[in-house]
Structures are given as structure tokens and as C-alpha cells.
Amino acid sequence: MEVPEIEKQIGINLYSTDTTGLGGQLRQEIEDFIVKEITNREEGEEGKYLIVELTKRDWDTHHLTRTLSRILQVSQKRISVAGTKDKRALTTQKISIFDTDASEIEKIHLKDIELKVLGRSRKSVELGDLWGNDFRITVRNIENSPEETEALLKKTTDEILAQGGVPNFFGIQRFGSVRPVTHLVGKAIVEGNFEKAALLYIAEPFPEEPEETKNARQFVKDTLDFKEGLKTYPLRLGHERAMMNHLIANPEDYSGSFRVLPQNLYRMFVHGYQSYIYNIILCRRIEAGIPLNRAVEGDIVCFRNEVGLPDSSKTEKVTSETVNAMNRLLKLGRAFITAPLPGYNTEFASGIPGEIENGVLKELGVSLEGFNIEKFPEMSSKGTRREVLLEVKPKFEAGEDELNPGKSKAVLEFMLPKGSYATTVLREYMKVNPLQMS
């Protein structure tokens, strides 16, 4: 089945299942997307950190932590989370607040927010605490009858289970859902062209954007008149406006214009380009008929860490002598085949997997030295590897859609490790434009 054009733009050109798509739409209601964080934390009664269970509905994580810091009259730096959760969802996660009494939480009354004190700890909540997330997702407005939907759910699930999961693609969120430009900016940066990178981010219009935004971007793209452009750029485009203000004050300082952005944003550009290359390599492996759950000579595998998650820092290359033993570990779920997120110091596979990896780099004209970015060292990346198979065992049910008479709905439940995308699973069931999943 043909994939949408927007997915081809981010390096994904196939589905791993052969079934007809359900169609339908996500998030018709906020409660259609429920996420519960899984951590390895156990709280006690002592320590400087107050540990709180946060359930939020339709709140951005960063906006919420700013709001909590204002109400509690503490620095935002004293509030820690293990991971950022979807805004348009009902999500539950742990947060820690440094040097705050439990009684202070009772003073917080925010719409669509529930806070429950769990205890105290000597350690803040941090990214390393996160194992993964449990999802319960409702797909609505499906044209089929409930019986047809149930049959399709079963067929797709059977195919997913038979192949051990789904390809561990980077989803559209990694690149920008409405405006998938992140990897294009990253490519220009790796090629040393900061002017092109800045203009792509500031001024490249995309079809799904509002008309006024497209017109504003097109004007700046055509004229490079940042001063005049600022008059028409919507205030919500704060990052682009900040870059333009820098360029007005510092003409031609395109690399410097990226320094006005938050670190977590400017680091995403090179990561986005690496993710694009990874997606293409993963597609080529599938097209070559090489399994994702069985190693061949030359593959690089990684192993589980102490909490059971794939650890890309512990790798081994598969040889003719070790291939059988490695496949036993793969079958037991103790090892994982990987593909590269290339950088200036990445280990590449050999054999047929290596030919695929190096072939994609050559085809795209990628220079690994380019990932060592002298003008902006904080953007540099030595690269890493990522497991190619996302192990998932979905449970499902179908029924009448009470919000859309005459249509059916599907409910899917599954657990994913951190760093994976629910839409990577959902795309195999729905087979729709990713914008219908945002």
C-alpha cells in the first residue's frame, strides 16, 4: 500500500503489514489518547524531593511546569519530570519538586490537573527513571462495521506479532507534524551552510500551514527583508522572530542566529537529519528482505541494560561464528539488531547490512566529518545506533462509535519503551496521512 507523501519526505516509504488500513481519526476527544508513564522508582518518606503523581488533560508539559513554579513561588528548575508527554492527551506521570512541603500541593487548583502526593525521595525524578509508557488509544470515525473493524484489527495484529513488532521508525513528531523541516535544517548545518539552514527554518513555507503564515514566510524567502517580515510573522512563531531579530542586529551572522533558540530545539536539527537517514536505512533493509528480528553476518546488535531496555552503548558485531548464538539471544529478547544514527564517530555494520548503510550515505552524499560542527560544537554528534524493531504486543477491541453514528471505533492498548512513538504502531493499523494522527 502506498504511503502518504509526507512520510516519504521523512524517509519512510513502506508499511511492514499488508492489511487494508482502518482509516479513521485520533483524538476526537482528549480521552481518546491515554498515556501512563512506567518508571522504576519507589518512593519513601524522607528526602528533599517531594514526589507527586501528575495527571493532566490537554496541558503542555513545559507550560504546566511554568504554571506550577509560579503558584508555588519556586524556580522552575526545582520541578523535574522524566519525560515530556503529549499535550492533546490524558497523561499520568511522576514529577519531583525540590524542598517543598506536601501541604503546598493542596493549594493548587488548576482545571484538568490532578496532583497526588506519593512520598519523598533523596533523588529527583529524571529521564533515566523512565522505562516506557502504557497507551490506551481510541481510533474513531471508521467507515467499516464493528465486525469488519474487529477482523482488520486481528489481521494486522497477527502480522505484527508474527514479525516480532513493527519497524522502529522515527515518527513525524521528530521532524515537525505540520512542517517537517527539522531534518532539512540539520542537513544544511551538517553541510556547513548555516545561511541555508536559517532560511529554511525561518522562511520555508509548507502546504499545511495557515495561509497568512505561508505568505509571511514566502515574503521573507523572496526578499530576505527580516525587518519588514517581522511585521507579518504571527507572534506564535516566537523562535523564527527571535532569529530574525538577531539577523537584523547582526547581518549575515546565520550561525549565531541559532544561538537565540533553546538548546533542546537547536539540538533537534542534527538529530532530525540523523533520524531521516536512519529511517531510509531501515526501509532499505526491509526492501532487501533482511529480517528485523534475525541477525545476519555483519549486523551490529546491542544488549539489554540493567532495567531491561536496549542499550546502544553495549554493542557487538555478528560474525559467522557468533550468528547462531546471537539469534538465540535475539529470540530471548536479550539482544537487538541496530541501525546507525550517523555521526563523526559511528560504528557501521559490515556484510550486506553494511552495504545498505554505506550505500545510503553515499546516495545522500553524507560526509561524516560534517557532524563535527566547528561553528557550533554543541550541535555536533558522534552518532549512535538504535534498535530496528519496536517490540509491541497490542490488545484490541472494536465497537460502535458513540460520537459518530453509523461508524465504528477501535481501541488499542500497548506498552512501548521510552524513545519510541505510538504513531509508529498506529500507522500500521490506520494507514492514513500522519496529520490525521496528530
From Swiss-Prot:
One of its GO terms (molecular function) is RNA binding. It holds the Pfam family TruD. Its EC number is 5.4.99.27. The active site is at 86 (nucleophile). It catalyses: uridine(13) in tRNA = pseudouridine(13) in tRNA. It is an enzyme of class 5 (isomerase). One of its GO terms (biological process) is tRNA pseudouridine synthesis. The keyword Isomerase applies. Residues 165-390 form the TRUD domain. Keywords: Isomerase, tRNA processing. Belongs to the pseudouridine synthase TruD family. Could be responsible for synthesis of pseudouridine from uracil-13 in transfer RNAs. NCBIfam families: tRNA_TruD_broad. This is Probable tRNA pseudouridine synthase D. It comes from Methanosarcina mazei (strain ATCC BAA-159 / DSM 3647 / Goe1 / Go1 / JCM 11833 / OCM 88) (Methanosarcina frisia).
